[in-house]
Amino acid sequence: MSTTNLAAQAFAKNRAEELGFDLWGEFVVPLYYDRLALDEVRKPLIFEGGRGCGKTTLLRYLSHATQLSPNRELTPETLPKQIGLYLRADTQHLRTFRGEALSEDDWQRAFEHDLCLSIATELLGALQLLSSTAQRRQTFPGIEALDFAAWRDFDASAPTTLAALIRHIRSARNKFSMWLNNQDGDQPRPTFLPLRPALIELIGVVREQLDFMRDRVFFVFIDEYENLLEYQMRAVNTRLKHSEAPLIFHIATKRNGMVTRQTLSSEQLQERDDFRTCDIEEWAEADFSLFAAELFCSRLQRKGIAVGPQEIEAGILLSLTGIKTRLDDQAYRRETLEAARKILPGLSNESAARHVLQDKSLSGRLRDNINTGLKLSDASYQPDDFIRTDLAQDALCVPALLHQGKKPKDLLAELEKKAAKKTNLFDTANWTHNYFSASMYLLFLPLPTPCVLYAGFDAFLKLSKGNTRHFLELCHLSLQGTDVIGGQVQSVDIKTQAMAARDASALFVKETQGSGDFGNRLFHVVNTLGQVFRLSHARPSQSEAERTHFAISGGDLKPDAQKLLSECLKWSVLFVAPETKVKGARLETMDYMFNPIYAPYFGISFNKGRKLELPASSVETLMTGRHEEMNALVKSYQKAWKLDGDGDQYSLFSQA
């Protein structure tokens, strides 16, 4: 029996919002999990990373909907020491907390009132979930008998039972929303709750009246912190600075999402003293090859497809105690990776080169490129003199070497040496190592089919750069139309994978338009920078091979440009790292790397190749220039690199 698209369906859900709040039995425990040390931590954590790296999924796993899931068997001994309360900072809602109707101080109190009601709702909801079945009420007695009379110190009309108080607070939130959205109307202003005193009193009731909750600590997880207005950040920062048991605040944010460390007092947040940063993106990338392979096998197994180690089917990915085995068992690691590579095979460099020689269109382009290079020096030679199936990789590098001024007779001599297994410059001067991949991308640049180097599980890892969502989308598109026969999924064709990589890349380029307040601008930054790198890849000499990152030279950026650069980092359009290979006497700054997921759309390398030195003035044009100025920037590089015509270049503002 054949089932089409069953395998692709396994990867259709690639956003936390699609998975819901209860992730018990579905969440693949990340390999870095033990680094969080949640049982010991009593200091706020800042979970940092780009969109798609798994922050939201992790926070939902740590929150009560999963911890106290009806699908989980709980006892007083297995009841989590920390009860997680999850809140998401909704941009549209938060921006209603401003305007001339109130002073900023009053808006801050209104915001804290709303935050208090939201946290109280989560806390009471956790108790309700813990008593949701007869068995649980027997295991955790007394929840329904809780007396919340102490809450009347803050709200005299509040009922005292759990179910009634939940309804009352829900009603209070609704009335608050009505007041918030009708500032010019007759809605009475509510009495604002004091955030920490009210919540501490509520927690006190729970801890005093329920023995099994006596030592429990409540973790408030605020997701998408970067959506807060600045005064709201100061309010949350204050809660971070003064967090202590039994109520500790944690936040998740994109890079550069914390625009201020100021609190409501003169104090500022200090790392180490007040919080610890958990760089989820960096931690995930360290073991991403194994984690991605595990996720790949797990998703397919849930669809009834036989793939990967038996340990995955037995639930090792769902267990906190299984992490050490996953990391240390080399046989398990090998079997998991091999399973993913079997379904998503890639080409070795040698196989990719042979693919070119066997393809009529690609081999024809190779001959044309060699012929063009020969005309620069000695047209008496023929392209076929340099094309040898036993030296396929080296043959692909010949056009670049000819355009660098190497003599045809010298290249032939070096090829002969290599064929005879003698010392040769293709090896000792790293000609093949330096120019093979760049030469492959150049051959494919003007063609409708994407480069085969984008295909394969290992290529998908590099394209994803630790981003789970990007990896899942690459798998989803690759497996569309793939048959499952007898419970086995077939290997995906190389060209199909490469096309899927380009389609996914186009999707994520387009998605930059929705990246916050500056989304449209970031979309144009991606298109402009992508075209500059594409032009660099189109240079016949490949003297600066595989350019995919830049450094800024010639001064500091103006504030507006610096802000946009920060947005590029926040939304993972660019990644930043300390600069390497600084030329001349210039001081070391930073390298800005193009997100590799954009590479297939522009036909460029996903590797960190050579660097482009961009003057600060050009970066300012890139970040804040008008459309015509950005076009002129691209054309200036086209002229400087002596590239005629733009027929096979993407339109600068093409819609991905």
Regions found by a protein language model. Name each.
Residues D184-A252, L264-S265:
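Conserved Walker B catalytic segment
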Residues A252-G257, T468:
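A short beta-strand-to-loop transition that corresponds to the Sensor-1 phosphate-sensing loop
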Residues M258-D274:
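Short regulatory helix/loop adjacent to the ATP-binding pocket of P-loop NTPases
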Residues T336-A656:
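C-terminal leucine-rich, beta-strand-based interaction scaffolds used for sensing/assembly
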Residues T56-E208, E271-Q393:
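P-loop NTPase nucleotide-binding core
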Residues M1-R88, F97-E100, D105:
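Walker A/P-loop-proximal flanking segment of P-loop NTPase domains
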Residues E26-L31, R35-V41, E100-A101, I200-L202, ...:
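Short linear interaction motifs
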Residues R42, P80-I83, R216, E244-I248, ...:
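Short glycine-/polar-rich loops that comprise or flank the Walker A/P-loop
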